[in-house]
From Swiss-Prot:
PROSITE patterns xref list: AA_TRNA_LIGASE_II
Reactions listed under catalytic activity: tRNA(Asx) + L-aspartate + ATP = L-aspartyl-tRNA(Asx) + AMP + diphosphate
Gene symbol of the encoding locus: aspS
Native source organism of the sequence: Neisseria meningitidis serogroup C / serotype 2a (strain ATCC 700532 / DSM 15464 / FAM18)
Role of this protein: Aspartyl-tRNA synthetase with relaxed tRNA specificity since it is able to aspartylate not only its cognate tRNA(Asp) but also tRNA(Asn). Reaction proceeds in two steps: L-aspartate is first activated by ATP to form Asp-AMP and then transferred to the acceptor end of tRNA(Asp/Asn).
Main localisation: cytoplasm
Name listed for the protein in its UniProt record: Aspartate--tRNA(Asp/Asn) ligase
């Protein structure tokens, strides 16, 4: 019987006999004495086997990396000069008396302590990958976060209620994963993109405070922070306004960070959406980076420089500057790389001015400003740019000029890139936790492709008080009772006050060009139940995967999920998704127009 975990044996167990079980992390033969580092989920302990115990010595001699062993022995101090203060077990070792080989192991595809393994190799051999200490730590922290959330919400009076995994398809922005019904041929369930409607119905049912930690599914193009199946900390409350909900969930975030990382997050400032977009080009600004946009659209309306003037005069156009302290030292190569980078976001180029001498702001050859564009701008404009940005000698000013969406995304991404690469050494990046709330989101945004307004969050978000009439008369300026929790440039949670009156919900659907017939067909069960005395209610959902990714400092969300999918939505461990046989398809009344092999060949 195991008496101790390997990584938890300390000096308090000196001279005691212990039994540990685990994997051979490393084996060394030192002139007739064998050393084995035995590993389990709690860490590593050093085991010494000498020839005086011949059976144990023979077992140790046959063992190789990743063999599974049971070892019984006496705990003793390590010899002087061989201790490791970074480990709980670093001052002791076990002198083995008995060793049992519980299982042999094939040679693993990579060493457990090898940090230079490609992600494809890791995901194909995920079980071995999960033995690595960093992965063990990540998933243990994930567990701690989930348990901390449960403890906090339980104490706040929330009830854990499960909602269905098989439900109806309702449009929420991304494509649904569909599940064909065998019992109802030609009909489909959908895996939920969120428990949104069910949690609202639980409020109508009178449960007052609900939560669950649940899987959600979205069939969308994947990025570093997205998975087709992801875990959501979902909650909903009745009779609370947005300030009260934000206070509760802010308290939860603070408690979780304190318990898991011993970090005090402090208070969360609140920033209107319009301010976030104006100064940072993003609704999830990374406040560790002290760089802001400077608005120049008005100034460029009277300039002759076509690139800036064209954007300033364009409907929905924008011209901004981004001052980077000490950036004049950027090389031509670095600026070219930044130009390519903003091109990813649709920018056609990246204009810049290096500030060498603020005392000479002419646009002539002797100008204190260095740039190909200086000669195209008036001296008045140059002086105004320097004044507005507060630029000093040695700075560089980057410019964005295009549709506001392109400018915001391109220069916003540049702000992050420059800030992370150069901010620490130049004083405009602080490596700390910077949370905030972004509030006062627009209710709708215009979808040029669909030629109509769509919901920014989802169509069940309530309009800001006094904005109900704007939903139809001026949807572009209608604000929502929505709020996002942002941490270091990541949206880790988003929520809103919901619509609790059927007539208001019908007006929102109408503003989104959803006909009464379509409303009833897709959302009739919601509209019908809102008529039975639905309480005012609202909530929030946290992305558990994103939150843990931030807390661990992992490079990818895939590093905090036990068995994730690739960016092509595949599981390399099990080779899912996979083809199914014709019999299974016939049972589901399905016939494929194109076989999987044909699709891959095409």
């Amino acid at each position: 019987m195991r008496t101790n975990y390997c990584g938890l044996i300390s000096e308090q167990y000196l001279d005691q006999t212990v039994t540990v079980k685990g994997w051979v992390h490393r084996r060394r033969d030192h002139g007739g004495v064998i050393f084995i580092d035995l590993r389990d989920r709690e860490g590593i302990v050093q085991v010494v086997i000498d020839p005086d115990t011949p059976e144990a010595f023979a077992a140790a001699d046959s063992a190789r990396n990743e063999y599974v062993l049971s070892i019984t022995g006496r705990v003793r101090n390590r010899p002087e000069g061989t201790t490791n203060d970074k480990m709980i077990s670093g001052k002791i070792e076990i002198l083995a008396k008995e060793i049992e080989v519980l299982n042999a192991a094939a040679t693993p595809p990579f060493q457990i302590d090898d940090e230079n393994i490609s992600e494809n190799v890791r995901l194909t051999n995920r079980v071995i990958d999960l033995r690595r200490p960093v992965m063990q730590r990540n998933l243990r922290l994930r567990y701690q976060v989930a348990m901390g959330v449960r403890r906090y919400l339980d104490a706040q009076g929330f009830i854990d209620i499960e909602t269905p995994m098989l439900t109806r398809s309702t449009p929420e922005g991304a494509r649904d994963y569909l599940v064909p019904s065998r019992v109802h041929p030609g009909e489909f369930f959908a895996l939920p993109q969120s428990p949104q409607l069910f949690k609202q119905l639980l409020m109508v049912a009178g449960f007052d405070r609900y939560y669950q930690i649940t899987k959600c599914f979205r069939d969308e193009d994947l990025r570093a922070d997205r998975q087709p199946e992801f875990t959501q900390i979902d909650l909903e409350t009745s009779f609370l306004n947005e300030d009260e909900i934000m206070d509760i969930t802010e308290g939860m975030a603070k408690q979780v960070f304190k318990d898991a990382l011993n970090v005090d997050l402090g208070d969360f400032p609140r920033m209107p959406y319009a301010e976030a977009m104006f100064y940072y080009g993003s609704d999830k600004p990374d406040m560790r980076i002290n760089l802001k946009f400077t608005e120049l659209t008005d100034l460029m309306k009277t300039e002759e420089f076509k690139v800036f003037r064209g954007a300033a005069d364009m409907k929905g156009g924008r011209v901004v500057a981004l001052r980077v302290p000490n950036g004049a030292k950027f090389s031509r190569k670095e600026i070219d790389e930044y130009t390519k980078f903003v091109g990813i976001y649709g920018a056609k180029g990246l204009a810049y001015i290096k500030v060498n001498d603020v005392g000479n702001l002419s646009n002539g050859e002797d100008s204190g400003l260095q740039s190909p564009i200086v000669k195209f701008l008036s001296e008045n404009a140059l002086k105004e740019i320097i004044a507005r940005t507060g630029a000093e000698n040695g700075d560089i000013i980057f410019f964005g000029a295009d549709k506001a969406k392109v400018v915001n995304e391109a220069i916003g991404a540049l702000r992050i890139k420059v800030g992370l690469e150069h901010g620490a050494e130049n004083g405009y990046f602080t490596d700390e936790w910077k949370p905030l709330w972004v509030v006062d989101f627009p209710m709708f945004e215009y979808d040029e492709e669909a030629d109509r307004y769509v919901a920014v969050h989802h169509p069940f978000t309530a309009p800001k008080e006094g904005h109900e009439d704007l939903m139809v008369s001026d949807p572009a300026n209608c604000l929502a009772r929505a709020y996002d929790m942002v941490l270091n440039g990541w949206e880790i949670g988003g929520g809103s006050i919901r619509i609790h009156r059927a007539d208001v919900q019908e007006k929102v659907f109408a503003a989104l060009k959803i006909s009464p017939e379509e409303q009833q067909e897709k959302f009739g069960f919601l509209l019908d139940n809102l008529k039975f005395g639905a309480p005012p209610h609202g909530g929030l959902a946290f992305g558990l995967d994103r939150l843990v990714t931030l807390m661990t400092g992992a490079e990818s969300i895939r590093d905090v999920i036990a068995f994730p999918k690739t960016q092509r939505a595949q599981c390399l461990l099990t080779n899912a998704p996979n083809s199914v046989d014709d019999k299974q398809l016939r049972e589901l009344s399905l016939r494929l127009r194109q076989k999987a092999a044909e699709t891959k060949e095409a």
